[in-house]
Amino acid sequence: MTFEMLYSKIHRATITDANLNYIGSITIDEDLAKLAKLREGMKVEIVDVNNGERFSTYVILGKKRGKICVNGAAARKVAIGDVVIILAYASMNEDEINTHKPSIVLVDEKNEILEKG
């Protein structure tokens, strides 16, 4: 049996851009994404702290430092400056659950890393 468990989280990131005309996804600063163990194309859930919206999309790695841009139709669910939580889950068996520790990255309002847990 497997269970859906928290794999990683970027906590309180700030939306820096929203691009309605892009195909889809969320663009995340590559250094920040890698620190959170997020991979290109990985499914993530976005929770908007400001408006309560919750939606799923996939990761695109961005080159610009601090960039968090929601693309495509999901751009209508956020506003620039909104604070979001970016979550990734993984299916794990009981042995994996016992040894797994989620990667949690806390950032400030400029998406600079405050703490990595």
Swiss-Prot record:
GO terms for molecular function: aspartate 1-decarboxylase activity. The modification Pyruvic acid (Ser) is found at residue 25. Is synthesized initially as an inactive proenzyme, which is activated by self-cleavage at a specific serine bond to produce a beta-subunit with a hydroxyl group at its C-terminus and an alpha-subunit with a pyruvoyl group at its N-terminus. Substrate binds at residues 57, 72-74. It comes from Helicobacter pylori (strain J99 / ATCC 700824). Pathway: Cofactor biosynthesis; (R)-pantothenate biosynthesis; beta-alanine from L-aspartate: step 1/1. Heterooctamer of four alpha and four beta subunits. Its main location: cytoplasm. Binds 1 pyruvoyl group covalently per subunit. The keyword Lyase applies. This is Aspartate 1-decarboxylase. GO terms for biological process: alanine biosynthetic process; pantothenate biosynthetic process. GO terms for cellular component: cytosol. Its cofactor is pyruvate. Catalyzes the pyruvoyl-dependent decarboxylation of aspartate to produce beta-alanine.
